[in-house]
C-alpha cells in the first residue's frame, strides 16, 4: 500500500515538474538563411547605388555651371580686365591700353554696397535674434516678430529695390540714386536670413552654460556677450556669409537703387555705382558689339559676351573667397576646448 502511495506521489511530482519547466525555444527557426542574407545584401547595395546616383544627379548642374563659366570666362579674365573700367570703351574696339574694358568699377561697387548692407543688416539681425531667444522666448511679441521675419524673407528683390528708391526719393529728392541706396535695398533681403540663422545657432547653445554663469553671479548681458554669442559664433558667421551670398548676386534692386556707370565711383553716398551682377546683365543685353566695315582687325564683335562670362566667373570667385574668410574667422574666434 505504501509503495503504491509512493509511486503515485512520484508520478504527480514528475507531472508537476514537467508542467513547471520553462518552454524550450528553438532559436534555429529564427536564424536567417543564406537566401535571406543575400536578399538583404542586394537591398543594401541597391540603396547605396540609388543614394550615389542621387548625389551625382545633384552635382551635375553645379559642375556644369562651374565648367561653363570657367571655360567661357577664363578667355577674357586677365590683369587688364581686373584693373580697368569701361571708360572710353566704344563697341568692340580696343582701348588705348590695348584692352577691351574691365570690371574694376564693378568690383569696387560690389564690395562697397555689400559691405554697407552688412553694416546695416548684421547688427539689426543679430540683436533681433538675441532678443527672440534670450528675452522674449515664447511670448506674443516673439511670435509677431517671427511672423514679420517670415514675411520679409518672401519679399521679391525688386520690391526691396522699389522701397529703397521710394524712400530716398522722399528723403533726398526725386531721382536720387547712389550706392548706399542699394545697400539699404540689399539689407532688407539680408536681415531675415541673419535673424533666422542666428536664432537657430543661439538655440543650440546648452542652457547649462547660461545657468552656470548666472549661478556664479554673472549678469545676463555679460553671459550673452561672453558665453552665448562666443559659443554660437561659428554658426552665426556661417549664417552671415550665407546672407551675403544670398544678396551679392542680386540685380533687379540694384538696377533701381544704384544704377549703372562706366567709370569708377568710390563714394558710396554720392552718385551711381555699378555691381558685378548689373555689369553682367548690361553686357549680356548687348549680345554683340558693333564693328563697322572699316574697323581695325582688333575689333571683336563677341566682346560683350566674353566680358559678361568673365565678370560672372569673378563673382563666383569672390563668393568663394568670402566663404573661406568666414570659415577662418569662425575658427579663430570659436571656443576651443582645453
Across the structure, where does each feature detected by a protein language model lie?
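N-terminal, non-cleaved signal-anchor transmembrane helix
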Residues: 1-104, 108, 112, 292-317, ...
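Transmembrane alpha-helix signature in integral membrane proteins
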Residues: 100-131, 240
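Amphipathic cytosolic juxtamembrane alpha-helices at the membrane-cytosol interface
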Residues: 124, 137-141, 206, 210-238
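Generic hydrophobic transmembrane alpha-helix motif, especially the helices
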Residues: 150-188
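Transmembrane-helix boundary motif in ABC transporter permease subunits
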Residues: 116-149, 170, 327-335
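Transmembrane alpha-helices
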Residues: 118, 197, 220-258
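Hydrophobic alpha-helical elements at and bordering transmembrane segments
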Residues: 46, 103, 107, 111, ...
